[in-house]
Amino acid sequence: MLNYLISAIIFVILDGFYINLIKKYFQKQISRVQGSNIQLRMIPTAITYVFLIFILEYFIISKKENYKTAFLLGFSIYAVYEFTNYSLFKNWTLLTVIIDALWGGILFGLTTFLTNILTRLFK
């Protein structure tokens, strides 16, 4: 349970940092696709985070997989999402696909790496 809590906190902090860093880029991207600004809905956002953190915990952290495997899982999840957008939305860019897929890998890998370090410190 400690692993799950630590990984969830790290995951949300890292993703929040990334979102703030790249916010303007994604605001432009979303505006090109839907013709209006981002309209974040909190409940679906929270559900998304629950699923992503569960996937990370279930497939990586609980099985003591390394950060490289976590990177591949995160990259794959985000790449599927981004290539789906790229296939469906005329104005979705390949650059967005690449940036976000790489971020998914970094997010999963770094969360795993930091969770492993912090879990050892708290035991």
Which residue ranges define each predicted feature?
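Juxtamembrane/disordered regions of integral membrane proteins
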Residues: 1-123
